[in-house]
Curated annotation (Swiss-Prot):
Keywords: Amino-acid biosynthesis, Isomerase, Methionine biosynthesis. Catalyzes the interconversion of methylthioribose-1-phosphate (MTR-1-P) into methylthioribulose-1-phosphate (MTRu-1-P). Its EC number is 5.3.1.23. This is Methylthioribose-1-phosphate isomerase. It catalyses: 5-(methylsulfanyl)-alpha-D-ribose 1-phosphate = 5-(methylsulfanyl)-D-ribulose 1-phosphate. One of its GO terms (molecular function) is S-methyl-5-thioribose-1-phosphate isomerase activity. Gene3D superfamilies: translation initiation factor eif-2b, domain 1, Translation initiation factor eif-2b, domain 2. The keyword Transport does not apply. Substrate binds at residues 47-49, 88, 195, 246-247. The record marks 156 as: Transition state stabilizer.
Length: 346
């Protein structure tokens, strides 16, 4: 499918496919400043933890270009980097990308702003390419866990649109297809932003992979009827004990999968694993604007004055997870030991 994250040398800008309007139209959003990057992250022009990380990496470069000519460019740049890092609280990839650029700056020593920006742009492009490669490796390992004829349920969108390309959870689906297996997908619609109905269905349909959209509240019936053989989801953060923080509703899907004896897998690159955070309950959960729940498009669907919950994520406890599929292989319980060894070996 179309590359949805593109760096344009001609514009000196990051050009993003605006996911708010998919699948009905394909608009593009140009990011030239720190505020552009922050807006793209906050309003979800771009979303999905790996894609957020790639966007943030390019954003650091743009933040540097923005302060050119400032007498105190170092202080201004620090402020811009902090703005980007704090744009969204849950996805660890955002923090990782900004801290990676801060590390490079610290190690570069007394370089000029132009030199720093050149180093950052090179690193952002590397992160971009590396993310696609990691997703392809996740697909290879995860595809081996899928059986010919499986119907795979997924929640939210952890596909090419949520990464630099190929996808994590949908990378597993693509990996299975590449291995010659016939698989199909049930995409939970994923209220309130409808990432499953709008985005997962969009990219799988374009790729010719069979997909059906299900209402979120149909999961139990579909599993009871034997229509689901595996569940594969992505993650915005995996904590040190193997808890997986993903789109709101994932926890409920995992509970149902256990009830019906269906393997529940999490697909995520290693840099989505946060060994500094002990458990999923320690992760800050983003509470988004009420209008995402009270409105569908421009149409209000709840009475004026009624309050709503709009938590964007929930933590799925590690005991519900059959395996965490990474580009380094599949982690199995006990996850605390597996994750510790992963970071010791890498």
């Amino acid at each position: 499918m179309t590359e949805h994250i593109q760096f344009s040398p001609e514009k000196d800008a990051l050009v993003l496919l605006d996911q708010r309007y998919l699948p009905t139209r394909e608009d593009w959003f140009d990011c030239k400043t720190t505020d552009d990057i922050v807006e793209a992250l906050v309003v979800m022009v771009v979303r999905g933890a790996p894609a957020i990380g790639v966007t943030a990496a390019y954003g650091c470069y743009l933040a540097g270009r923005e302060v050119a000519g400032s007498a105190d460019w170092k202080a201004e740049l620090e402020k811009n980097l902090d703005k980007i890092e704090n744009a969204r609280p849950t996805a660890v990839n955002l923090r990782w990308a900004v801290r990676e650029m801060k590390r490079i700056w610290a190690e570069a020593g007394d370089v000029s702003l132009d030199e720093l920006c050149a180093i950052w742009l090179k690193r952002a492009k590397e992160i971009h390419v590396d993310d696609i490669r990691m997703c392809e490796d996740i697909g290879k390992f995860g595809g081996e866990l899928m059986d010919d004829g499986d119907t795979i349920m997924t929640h939210c969108n952890a596909g090419a649109l949520a990464t630099a390309g190929y996808g994590t959870a949908l990378g597993v689906v693509r990996g299975a297809v590449d291995q010659g297996k016939k698989v199909s997908v049930i995409a939970n619609e994923t209220r309130p932003f409808l990432q499953g109905a709008r985005l997962t269905a969009y990219e799988l349909h374009r790729d010719g992979i069979p997909v059906k959209v299900a209402c979120d509240n149909a999961c139990a019936l579909l599993m009871k009827k034997g229509l689901v053989q595996k569940v594969v989801v992505g993650a915005d953060r995996v904590t040190a004990n193997g808890d997986a923080v993903n789109k709101i509703g994932t926890y409920g899907v995992a509970l149902l999968a256990r009830e019906f004896g269906i393997p529940f897998y999490v697909a995520a690159p290693v840099y989505t694993i946060d060994p500094e955070t002990p458990t999923g309950d320690d992760v800050p959960i983003e509470d988004r604007t009420p209008t995402e729940v009270t409105h569908v498009g421009d149409h209000r669907i709840t009475p004026e004055g009624v309050e709503v919950f709009n938590f964007a994520f929930d933590p799925t406890p590690n005991e519900l997870i059959a395996g965490i599929i990474t580009e380094k292989g599949v982690l199995r319980p006990p996850y605390t030991e597996a994750i510790k060894k992963l970071f010791e070996d890498n």
